[in-house]
Amino acid sequence: MAFGALLALSAALGLPTGPTCTYDASTATVQAQMVSARTVVGNAGDGRILVDGRVCGTLAQTRQIVVASAFPPGTDTVVVDERHGRLAEPSSMRRPKVFALTGTGGDTMEVIGTAGRDRYVAYNDLGASIDLDADRAPDFVSTDVGRIVLRGMAGDDVLSDGRSGHDRLACGPGLDTVRAGSGNTVTGCERSLPRRHP
């Protein structure tokens, strides 16, 4: 049965259509299979990892989160949502690395910030990657991505994207600093420093 037909049948029968996820203790890995074109990974606010609202592991035990897609190229969006807390183990602030295995195409990586000060930096390596904690090491990596969206929320954020193209940087309340590559869209920002790298 085709994947799309399986989704339609699940919806008709009232079966859950959220992501399927497993935790592999031997590799400390959460594995999530996308069953819609947009998947959100976040912190429940208490150290549990949520994928589209379902508990899939804990930040204390998980070293990596792998999100895989079965959708056509260019249609996937994988979101790291930090509105309920950083996607990091609370005592050490150690982050699991998030891998978005979306295949080829112009897929989207998106980050939604915390209520405090955030520093997110997008890079053009390994397909595309985003540093979520200013340590110069990517925390969110995609195999092939056409667009990155960085959303600052409250707090004085630093959003930096040296990639040129179709990315979007959206600021929230606070005094934000933005460094955007040529061709990127910047919205809602009080202060913008275009085309400068961190």
Identify the residue ranges that each predicted region occupies.
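Secretory targeting and sorting signals
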Residues: M1-G14
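Acidic, glycine-rich low-complexity segments
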Residues: A11-P198
